[in-house]
């Protein structure tokens, strides 16, 4: 490993210790490399504004940073174990190509605010993706709720048959859930949309850095004012972003659970498209719902990443090397979470209900609640009506149909009044 930015003259570096210190940073930093380049360009512009760099030096740095970004995208430059991290790789390349101008670019900044700003830009992009995917899922669910509003579906509590429900209600539930997930991701985006560049190692520097310029140039909504809070927010903002992702993957886990049950032979309510199943290596008859099972497992990875960062934050104020581990947590957590969410809209759009199986699962007892409420409307005290309906639940469905039960469910949000216009207005507000 070469290009250790912190190495002191005459002090040898133990290779094993350095390998331990670096960990898998350089591999993880591939996620942040282009963001670090963008922030380096903005920082160089700010240095020129205060006289640290000449216009000529700024021009050379900007050109070389653009070339490095292009080389990285094309594979001509590989961020590998020759470098400690992305920051040292950028500085080494600039110094190699430009000499003193490359050695000047780190003036007024630390690797601490360098990774803070790169991570902040990365998180903004990831949160936008969470919001976009949640919005896509909500759109599929809204459209299907409209189209299948009157399709009877057995409603369950405790995984036991409970009341007559509808496909419209099932879809509307997921639509509202993912609208909220998009809102939460957007709100978290606003939290992290603050510029830490220029806070250095957490105590500022003796230079009049043009932080207003870097804030505008990098597209941040505001400046993160306090250098100490900039360091305190490392991990805190990552935790908030994982919580926003986790809201979506938590709902993903529950919808995957529903589909795991509904596609089983014991329920057979839903036909899963063949491309979302796999086979068994020994049982020729099997079509396994591996995709939805791994979707169901995804939230565990996101929750684990969140827990890792939460435990890392048992620290006093100021920078601590422990925080290096937060990078792996967010990279792995978002990789798993977004990969699963990417598949969800198409999966939901292609599910097929089996109306005959749905109707067959609606038994007489599922009308007992209707009977009790109707008696209460007629003047019978509800508790007495409840007891009478419970005693006669086996015959509660006599002369009744699922469609009539759904038509009578007029409370706002229930089967006869899904209020999809309200949900669609909330969805449109996300656009």
Swiss-Prot record:
<keyword id="KW-0055">Arginine biosynthesis</keyword>
<protein>
    <recommendedName>
        <fullName>Argininosuccinate lyase</fullName>
        <ecNumber>4.3.2.1</ecNumber>
    </recommendedName>
</protein>
<keyword id="KW-0028">Amino-acid biosynthesis</keyword>
<dbReference type="InterPro" id="IPR009049">
    <property type="entry name" value="Argininosuccinate_lyase"/>
</dbReference>
<dbReference type="InterPro" id="IPR024083">
    <property type="entry name" value="Fumarase/histidase_N"/>
</dbReference>
<dbReference type="InterPro" id="IPR008948">
    <property type="entry name" value="L-Aspartase-like"/>
</dbReference>
<dbReference type="InterPro" id="IPR022761">
    <property type="entry name" value="Fumarate_lyase_N"/>
</dbReference>
<keyword id="KW-0456">Lyase</keyword>
<comment type="similarity">
    <text>Belongs to the lyase 1 family. Argininosuccinate lyase subfamily.</text>
</comment>
<dbReference type="GO" id="GO:0006526">
    <property type="term" value="P:L-arginine biosynthetic process"/>
</dbReference>
<comment type="pathway">
    <text>Amino-acid biosynthesis; L-arginine biosynthesis; L-arginine from L-ornithine and carbamoyl phosphate: step 3/3.</text>
</comment>
<dbReference type="GO" id="GO:0004056">
    <property type="term" value="F:argininosuccinate lyase activity"/>
</dbReference>
<keyword id="KW-0963">Cytoplasm</keyword>
<dbReference type="Pfam" id="PF00206">
    <property type="entry name" value="Lyase_1"/>
</dbReference>
<dbReference type="InterPro" id="IPR020557">
    <property type="entry name" value="Fumarate_lyase_CS"/>
</dbReference>
<dbReference type="GO" id="GO:0042450">
    <property type="term" value="P:arginine biosynthetic process via ornithine"/>
</dbReference>
<dbReference type="GO" id="GO:0005829">
    <property type="term" value="C:cytosol"/>
</dbReference>
<dbReference type="InterPro" id="IPR000362">
    <property type="entry name" value="Fumarate_lyase_fam"/>
</dbReference>
């Amino acid at each position: 490993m070469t290009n250790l930015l912190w190495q002191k003259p005459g002090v040898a570096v133990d290779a094993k210790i350095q390998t331990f210190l670096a960990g898998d940073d350089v591999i993880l930093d591939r996620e942040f490399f282009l963001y670090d380049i963008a922030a380096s360009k903005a920082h160089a512009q700010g240095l020129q504004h205060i006289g640290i760099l000449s216009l000529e030096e700024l021009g050379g740095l900007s050109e070389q940073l653009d070339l490095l970004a292009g080389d990285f995208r094309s594979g001509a430059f590989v961020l590998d174990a020759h470098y400690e991290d992305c920051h040292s790789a950028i500085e080494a390349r600039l110094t190699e190509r430009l000499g003193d101008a490359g050695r000047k670019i780190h003036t007024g900044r630390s690797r601490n605010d360098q990774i803070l700003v790169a991570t902040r830009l990365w998180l903004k992009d990831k949160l936008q993706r969470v919001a976009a995917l949640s919005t896509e899922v909500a759109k599929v669910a809204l459209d299907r709720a409209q189209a299948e509003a009157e399709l009877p579906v057995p409603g369950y509590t405790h995984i036991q048959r409970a009341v007559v429900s509808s496909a419209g209600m099932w879809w509307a539930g997921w639509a509202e859930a993912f609208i909220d997930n998009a809102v939460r991701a957007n709100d978290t985006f606003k939290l992290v949309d603050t510029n830490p560049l220029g806070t250095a190692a957490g105590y500022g520097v003796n230079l009049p850095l043009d932080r207003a310029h870097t804030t505008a140039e990098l597209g941040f909504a505001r400046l993160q004012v306090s250098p100490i809070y900039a360091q305190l927010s490392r991990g805190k903002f990552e935790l908030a972003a994982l919580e926003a992702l986790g809201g979506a993957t938590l709902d993903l886990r529950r919808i995957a659970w529903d589909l795991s049950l509904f596609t089983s032979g014991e329920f057979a309510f839903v036909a899963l498209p063949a491309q979302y199943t796999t086979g068994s290596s020994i049982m020729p008859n099997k079509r396994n719902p591996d995709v939805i099972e791994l979707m169901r497992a995804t939230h565990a990875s996101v929750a684990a990443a969140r827990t890792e960062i939460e435990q890392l934050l048992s620290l006093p104020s100021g920078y601590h090397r422990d925080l290096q581990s937060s990078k792996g947590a967010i990279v792995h957590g978002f990789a798993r979470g977004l990969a699963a969410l990417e598949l969800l809209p198409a999966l939901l759009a292609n599910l097929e209900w089996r109306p005959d199986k749905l109707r067959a699962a609606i038994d007489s007892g599922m009308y007992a609640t209707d009977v009790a409420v109707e008696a209460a409307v007629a003047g019978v005290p509800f508790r007495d009506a409840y007891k009478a309906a419970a005693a006669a639940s086996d015959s509660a469905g006599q002369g009744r149909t699922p469609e009539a039960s759904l038509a009578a469910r007029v409370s706002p949000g229930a089967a006869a009044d899904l209020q999809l216009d309200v949900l669609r207005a909330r969805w449109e507000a996300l656009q």
